[in-house]
Amino acid sequence: MVHFEQWEGFEGRIWREEVNVRDFIQKNYKPYAGDERFLAGPTEATDKLWGILQKLQKEERAKGGVLDMETHVVSGLTAYGAGYISEADKALEQIVGLQTDKPLKRAFMPFGGIKMAEEACRNYGYEPDPELHRIFTEYAPTHNEGVFMAYTPEMKKARHNKIITGLPDTYGRGRIVGDYRRVALYGIDFLIEEKTKDLANCGDGTMTEDVIRLREEIAKQIKALKGMKAMAAAYGFDISKPAANAKEACQWLYFGYLAAIKTQNGAAMSVGRISTFLDIYMERDLARGLITEAQAQELIDHMVMKFRMVKFARIPSYNALFSGDPVWATLEVGGIGVDGRSMVTKNDYRFLHTLENMGPSPEPNMTVLYSEDLPDAFKHYAAKISVLTSSVQYENDDVMKPVWGDDYSICCCVSATQTGKEMQFFGARANLAKCLLYALNGGVDVKTREQVGPAYRPVAGEVLDYDEVIAAYDRMMDWLAGLYVNTLNLIQYMHDKYYYEAAEMALIDTDVRRTFATGIAGFSHVVDSLSAIKYAKVTPIRDETGLIVDFKTEGDFPRYGNDDDRADDIAVWLLGKFLEKIKKRHTYRDSEPTTSILTITSNVVYGKATGSMPDGRKAGEPLSPGANPSYGAEKNGLLASLNSTAKLPYHWALDGISNTQTINPGALGHNDEERAKNLVQVMDGYFMQGAHHLNVNVFGTEKLIDAMEHPEKEEYANFTIRVSGYAVKFIDLTREQQLDVIARTCHDRM
């Protein structure tokens, strides 16, 4: 059994014999059932550093969204020396480490695609070093180049026509959460020893392709671990051994995360589930009199400050899909252990308290793992923070725990992954609304007039027949699912080949479980359109070529979002049918297929590429985001809308079901305390039905309109809203996306 002096005072055996952070947590954490009265406000150092950073953020916004960009140095673990928020005030920083050499400066990351890295620079007025272009076009192939060399004509056509879109073929796929806690608990040298053992035992003497690839990957992981040590040494820290105290635990853990964001520009670079783990160190130091509560809070404030600073260089087409500069540094608090004990600690409060000490912020993507069994005081405090900041999302721990255990992280917006045991292949989304139009028009795209899907017989007749439409849709969805999975298989293969996440995978078990994520866009529009065809009279309007370009819908029909089983049953059918078709296909590296109903802000882009629908949505209008009902469809209030979404089975959408709701403050109560109490009651009822996710916004439409018209007002500098799966500063959205948010339902009654 291994023993380090840094482990003095910790209980347990298994975690000492193998890399097992969960066992360490279960044997050592102390649940906290009290309220927030113990919390400390910001220290002088926190206020000063946050003030400096806010000034830099204002300069960044004034320069069009980018403060500075690298043009000569390729990002890597040791590409830069030490960097600080302020060189003059670096002694104030309790947690150190920047992606580059300056705060908010964006790194040059060409391995996902040299063209994209160069375009990101030029879009903001920076000219990349031509030598980098030569190197990455003549000598070092990139992920993007590999993908487009292998794409079939059919894949390219489907991508161009945006029936599958948002694909991670021009940027890092992300959604891989390294178990950054391992750096703090074990130190790098022990982790290297364990990976070296894995390398020695990889293969049984027959060098198959899988064995050869795995041996190469483990070797890359060991190299990355050594690079982490060198990176930390530049800041004067030796992370070869375990962390000895709370400050080192926070710093060591952050160095693990910093290694990930220095080497990958994934769409989601989640932090993971760290609050309870770090609380163990906090409690030990507090008991020994080594720190005060103010110092404990300062450590968390400074760590969160670093998460708020994460930036990547992006191209305009990426920003259109994922608006507002998100990085999904998702961080979880709360949850209940499989033994029934609450996993809420004082540290869970401290992380939420950063939204008070430093104000609202989209990052880290703060996520409460919700259960009706959470301590009442914690539920009330989280709800209060939601009412005050609209910066928190909630996910149902009671439906996720049976699948992922009690040590999972949220690896993107809403997707769970078992920490240190699993990885996810990110797969963007298929536009099922567009697929329905393909079914009606025999595979012809109404926007481009190209034959994209199979040339099946178009749906005929003066009035659409439900059974005929369903049969045609089933065939077209089958084609789309096959093409979608094949395209993703190709992308994931090339990402492993040219842009492997060595730093993150070094902090995950070698024998890793892989999930294969897919996604659905246009969900509610398909449901309502099929409902209209079934329960009303839908007459297709054809142009001179016979192509259906619009619809005349007569009569009432049930809409998803009103707790009406006639519509909601169609929604359940659609989700199950799509997953069934995905699961029939071969998936890369024996990964387990999952799907999601999640669109981010890409619903605007998807909508532009989608024609008119039978539900009344016109061509080019935004699609409704995630699993939300169509705009204007909700007629029976907030609770009815939530009840509809709750009927969607989580086990059919393990990649997540995103639901975003905006509630007028007056609808929740007369004051913040009453609003928090009522919000808890709403969430208890919603999640007890088996619902998966809820974004909560508490403000009125008039505030959004004022922020759009007067972004210069100080009160809107950090005005944060929840959108499909993440949070964003409202003034960082494009006007088109702001108008889309304003158009969404704001509930004035429960």
Regions found by a protein language model. Give the residues of each.
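Conserved catalytic cores of very large enzyme subunits
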Residues: 2-750
